[in-house]
Amino acid sequence: MKKLISRRNFLKVCALAGSAAALSACGGGKSTGSNNSAAAAVDVTGAVTFPLSEKVTFTGMTSFPVGSEPEPNNRTIFKRLEEQTNVHIDWTAIQSDQWSDKITLNMSNPNTLTDFVFTADFTDSNLLRYADQGVILNLEDYIDNNMPYLQKVFEKYPEYRTMCTDSDGHIWALPWIEQLGAEKTAIQTIGNMSFINTKWLNFLGLSMPTTVDEFEQVLMAFRDNAASIKAEYGIDGDIIPMSCIVNNGDQDPSILINGFGEGYGDADKDRHIAVTNDRKVICAATQQGYRDGLDWLHKLYAEKLIDPECFTQEWSTYVSKGKAGRYGVCFSWDVANIDNLTDWEPLPALTADTRNITPQNGSFTSGFARGRCVVTAKATNPALVCAWLDQMYAPLQSPQNNWGTYGDAEGFNIFELSTNDKGEPMLKHAPLGDASPVEVREAQCVSGPLAVLDDYYGVYVTCPDDAQYRLDWIKEIYTPDMNNDYVYPNVFMSNEDTEQVSNLQADLQTYMNTQKADWIMNGTTDAEWNEYLSKLEAYGLSDYLGIMQKYLDAYYA
């Protein structure tokens, strides 16, 4: 049983660790942040009615995207929340590309610890470590007593509460939930969607490829007709038949090899696991189909059909070349982030030995992040902090936090405030025009804990256009070829197993990804493949799969 450390004991740790100054930062001394008398004086015994009669102040940490507004309280969403709740937040804001380094330091220093961490995105090992140290609070009682919006979500979808709860029955963080479709039609089933330039296809009189051989012939046509393509469309720079970023999430080309062997592909590009139809966890990166697929990608690379920068290029470089119109095939969550929608279509599943699309693990329960937001032992009135955070789960609030807002006179607005069929307030998506969905949202949204549910669409918010066309693509093009009955679910392991999996995965993932890139570039031999399998076993692959299997069995027990 996990030992729970009370706030009082945590304050003792602070005092021992850092003298009177640290104690002041943790809970006494100078009246700053949530330690003001107004916050401490609010008696919270159930749901809280906002706005509060007297303004209170909490402290919070959050991240912001590079190039966007760095001061959270300058964002319209937080301005409105302060007006609606009479709660002011003193923010510590960290640029997203510096978050992982700085959040670790801030969580270990009582002088920089805040009442809550809005965009924590902690891993399970982070959550359990901070829980054991007494730095974060278990939240299940606050959820039941002070968070009616989140409680309503859990009542409707009890699987989310299960996924938030550790093996000892505690909830250490508030989740991010985004439903867009479900099961095999969920928007998260495919991350690294492949797109093909239909303008080039039509210009060369080519058909949409449906097999790996046809695909290779199309790439060769792009390569061999580069001069005429450049002249026809006024393209500066070399024509690149296919570009990608190997081992880089949604930009990775692994979806192309899903048809080799038994058709498992490599949809889980971090853990490299898949689930068979008889509910066995396997390593996708040790299957013969995986090797055959990489051999084929090497053939394409050797034929100069793949961008030579695919192993090293940054996102900005990848996008820049795409915006210049130089790609025949590319990979991303949405091609609109790379080029435009008009000239591109999703590439269907390619038949090799079989025809299959493996959905991403965890995708059948839609978008879910267990460790999105935590409340720390610094909070003098955690029930009130939780009551304020519960406002993020209000049906009209969650879509704004997730995507953006309305009524911002100084910038582009994601939404217009409209009404639904019953005359009730509803957020209506404004046209994006030529703007990048990612860039527009980053300018307004605040992320954090939230829940956008499928039954909100048409009632509280319209479905985003870029989500709707992606949902349509998945349902029409990919779902029919999803022959797998299972994906690996989002499970919360024990502290011991989380630590062991983390340690094993560090070596396994690094080695698998290194070899994957090397074999696409240089090819492989039987001897190298056999050595690879032996090394993976030495790195603990069987133990790793055994732990994963244990939790899969428990999930379906």
Pin down the residues of each PLM region.
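Extracytoplasmic/periplasmic substrate-binding proteins
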Residues: 56, 62-73, 180-195, 202-208, ...
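Glycine-rich, aromatic-lined ligand/substrate-binding cores of catalytic
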Residues: 299-301, 318-333, 342, 351-444
